[in-house]
C-alpha cells in the first residue's frame, strides 16, 4: 500500500520563523508552512512550538497527517492515539472556556471519520492486516454513529473492504462495499474488490486480496491525498427571533486543478473510489446544524467565534489500483 500526497504549492520568499504558539485557523502559519513548504517544515513547527492545551488534540491530528506523508506510519499512529485520548478528555470539558476565549477543540463529523481512516491507512501501509481490520471496524462504527446519509465516505468504506479482505474477513468486506456501485459512481475498482471478496466467501482463500498467480494481473494499490481542503470561518446560526448563536461554515478553496497520472505506463488504471472532503464537511456541518435547531445536540458556545480546523486535510482522498507491467515492481505517480 502506497500513500501519495500532491499539494498545490506557492513558492514563497524565505521561510518565516515559527515563534510562540501555533494557531489552527484558515490563515494560520501552520497552514502556510504545510502548503508552501511541505511536511518537514510543518513537523518542525509543531514539535518546537508551544501548543495551547485546548488545541493539543488538533495539533496531534496535524502531526499525524504530516508523519503519514513522510512515511513515518508508526509515529503517525502514536499521534492519532494521543489525539483520541485527548478528545475523550476534552469532550467532558467542552463547556470550559480558556482565558483565550476558546474551549477545547472538538472535531466535526468528517474529521472524526477521517482520523480513524488515517489510522487504518497507516496500519495497511505497515502490512498489519489484523490491526487494519480492527481500525476499519472503528471507522465504520464512527460513520454509523454519525448517521449522515448525505456524507459520501466512499474512500473510507473501500479502504475498509481492502483491510477486511487482507485479514480474511471477506463477509465484512462485502458489507463495507454496500452502495458503492450505485449508478454514477466509479465502479471498476469496487467491482474488482467485490469479486475477490465473494471468491473468499465462497471458499477460495487467497492470501489477503491477492489474485491467482497470473503474471498479467499484478497490481499496486495507492492512496492519493490530493489538493487543499476547504477552510472554516466564523458565522452565526439563527435559532429563532432574537436568538442566534456562534457557529461556523466551510468555505471552498479557489478552483484547483487536481490531477494525477502514471509515469511511463500504458497499462490500465482501475477507477478510483474517492471522498470529496468539501462535500462531506458541508453535509456533516449541515446535519449538526439541523440537530442543534431541533434540540438534539448542544452547540459549543465559546466567547469567540471558532474557525479552528484540521488544516492539512486534502481536497480529495482517492484509492486507485494500477496494473504493473511484468518487468516492474513499482510505478511512479505524478
Regions from the language model: what does each represent?
Residues 17-20:
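C-terminal motif of bacterial Sec signal peptides marking the signal peptidase cleavage site
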Residues 22-24:
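Bacterial signal peptide processing site
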Residues 28, 62, 66-69, 111-118, ...:
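"A position-specific structural signal for the A-helix of alpha-solenoid helical repeats
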Residues 31-46, 77-96, 126-141:
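Helix-turn-helix repeat elements of alpha-solenoid scaffolds
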Residues 55-57, 86-95, 144-152, 181-204:
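Boundary/linker segments of alpha-helical solenoid repeat arrays
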Residues 78-88, 137-138, 162-186:
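TPR/TPR-like (Sel1-like) alpha-helical repeat modules
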Residues 300-334:
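C-terminal soluble interaction/assembly domains
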Amino acid at each position: 500500500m502506497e500513500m501519495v500526497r500532491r499539494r498545490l504549492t506557492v513558492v514563497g520568499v524565505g521561510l518565516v520563523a515559527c515563534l510562540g504558539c501555533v494557531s489552527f485557523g484558515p490563515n494560520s502559519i501552520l497552514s502556510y508552512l504545510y502548503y508552501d513548504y511541505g511536511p518537514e517544515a510543518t513537523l518542525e513547527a509543531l514539535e518546537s512550538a508551544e501548543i495551547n492545551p485546548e488545541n493539543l488534540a488538533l495539533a496531534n491530528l496535524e502531526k499525524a497527517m504530516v508523519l503519514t506523508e513522510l512515511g513515518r506510519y508508526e509515529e503517525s499512529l502514536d499521534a492519532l492515539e494521543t489525539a483520541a485520548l485527548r478528545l475523550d478528555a476534552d469532550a467532558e470539558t467542552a463547556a470550559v472556556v480558556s482565558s483565550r476565549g476558546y474551549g477545547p477543540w472538538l472535531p466535526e463529523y468528517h474529521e472524526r471519520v477521517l482520523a480513524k481512516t488515517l489510522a487504518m491507512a497507516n496500519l495497511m501501509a505497515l502490512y498489519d492486516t489484523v490491526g487494519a481490520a480492527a481500525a476499519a471496524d472503528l471507522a465504520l462504527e464512527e460513520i454509523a454513529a454519525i448517521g449522515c446519509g448525505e456524507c459520501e465516505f466512499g474512500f473510507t468504506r473501500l479502504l475498509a473492504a481492502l483491510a477486511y479482505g487482507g485479514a480474511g474477513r471477506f463477509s465484512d468486506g462485502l458489507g463495507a462495499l454496500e452502495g458503492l456501485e450505485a449508478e454514477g459512481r466509479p465502479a471498476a475498482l469496487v467491482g474488482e474488490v467485490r469479486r475477490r471478496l465473494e471468491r473468499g466467501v465462497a471458499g477460495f482463500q487467497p492470501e489477503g486480496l491477492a489474485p491467482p498467480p497470473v503474471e498479467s494481473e499484478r497490481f499496486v494499490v495507492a492512496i492519493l491525498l490530493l489538493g487543499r481542503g476547504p477552510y472554516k470561518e466564523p458565522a452565526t446560526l439563527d435559532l429563532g427571533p432574537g436568538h442566534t448563536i456562534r457557529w461556523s461554515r466551510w468555505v471552498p478553496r479557489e478552483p484547483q486543478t487536481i490531477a494525477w497520472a502514471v509515469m511511463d505506463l500504458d497499462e490500465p488504471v482501475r477507477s478510483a473510489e474517492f471522498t470529496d472532503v468539501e462535500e462531506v464537511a458541508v453535509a456533516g456541518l449541515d446535519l449538526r446544524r439541523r440537530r442543534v435547531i431541533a434540540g438534539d445536540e448542544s452547540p459549543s458556545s465559546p466567547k469567540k467565534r471558532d474557525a479552528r480546523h484540521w488544516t492539512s486535510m486534502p481536497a480529495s482522498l482517492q484509492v486507485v489500483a494500477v496494473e504493473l507491467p511484468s518487468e516492474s515492481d513499482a510505478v511512479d505517480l505524478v
